[in-house]
């Protein structure tokens, strides 16, 4: 299938790109800077150098790719939690989730895309030591920096799930850990290895619909739906 992968050079995007190519898909992947294009070509991915905030340029790139599937792995987190730059990074990430998602979904709709898969987060539910499922409300009472995160996620998910003519899938990932992430081991619950997260996105190309928690087994978030409907395997690891 023809797939447009937005955010193809990030920690999860690179893994998604590789798995898609191994499965035989025709992949166009975005990067904001031309110097990352060779990395995509090495994977067999057609680079699209584009700024997702440039709606016209993004629409043209998607139109050229003519994708049946769009995968949204766009983030803009340049600073880790607890660092001085984290609040600014969260604001940048909120913008990409709102404006970037809007531009991407409009471009996908115009190009005749039939399915969209988007990265969300599983640590978006209200705090508390109870098991959360996809049917539980999000943390609408959040304050401060977390409020920005919740706002961005709500807009992203609604846009992906309600764009006319497109079957939307939202993957609510746990905290990433593994190579190319901030953490070598699970930092806290809910967590998910970056390889297993990428694999879930690839599975969703051909099955499933709606919202899925994608995390390792823990006491606060259930991924039973993703295991049952997608075949999500938290133990999946890519060969090195």
Predicted regions and their residues:
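Alpha-helical substrate-binding/gating segment
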Residues: 176-180, 187-212, 216-217
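NAD(P)H-binding glycine-rich loop region in Rossmannoid oxidoreductase-like domains
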Residues: 32-99
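Conserved glycine-rich Rossmann-like NAD(P)H-binding loop of the short-chain dehydrogenase/reductase
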Residues: 25-32
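Conserved SDR Rossmann-fold cofactor-binding beta-strand/turn motif
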Residues: 31, 172-173, 202
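C-terminal amphipathic/interface module of NAD(P)-dependent oxidoreductases
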Residues: 46, 50, 55, 220-240
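N-terminal Rossmann NAD(P)H-binding glycine-rich loop of SDR-like oxidoreductase domains
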Residues: 3-25
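Conserved beta-loop-beta element that borders a ligand/cofactor-binding pocket
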Residues: 115, 119-123, 155-179
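Conserved Rossmann-fold NAD(P)-dependent oxidoreductase catalytic core, especially the SDR/UDP-sugar
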Residues: 81-144
């Amino acid at each position: 299938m023809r797939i447009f992968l937005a955010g193809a050079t990030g920690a999860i995007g690179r893994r998604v790109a590789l798995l898609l190519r191994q499965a035989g898909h025709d992949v166009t992947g975005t990067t904001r800077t031309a110097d990352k294009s060779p990395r995509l070509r090495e994977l067999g991915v057609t680079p699209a150098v584009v700024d997702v905030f440039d709606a016209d340029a993004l629409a043209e790139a998607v139109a050229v790719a003519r994708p049946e599937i769009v995968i949204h792995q766009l983030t803009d987190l340049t600073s880790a939690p607890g660092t001085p730059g984290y609040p600014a990074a969260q604001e940048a990430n909120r913008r990409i989730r709102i404006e970037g998602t809007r531009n991407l979904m409009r471009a996908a709709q115009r190009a005749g895309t039939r399915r969209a898969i988007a990265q969300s987060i599983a640590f978006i539910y209200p705090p508390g030591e109870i098991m959360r499922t996809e049917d539980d409300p999000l943390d609408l009472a959040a304050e401060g920096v977390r409020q920005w995160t919740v706002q961005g996620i709500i807009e992203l998910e609604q846009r992906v799930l309600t764009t006319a003519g497109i079957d939307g899938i939202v993957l609510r990932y746990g905290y990433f850990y593994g190579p190319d992430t901030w953490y070598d081991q699970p930092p806290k619950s809910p967590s998910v290895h970056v390889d297993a997260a990428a694999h879930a996105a690839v599975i969703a190309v051909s099955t499933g619909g709606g919202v899925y928690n994608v995390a390792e087994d823990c006491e606060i978030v259930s991924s039973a739906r993703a295991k049952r409907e997608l075949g999500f395997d938290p133990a999946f690891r890519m060969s090195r």
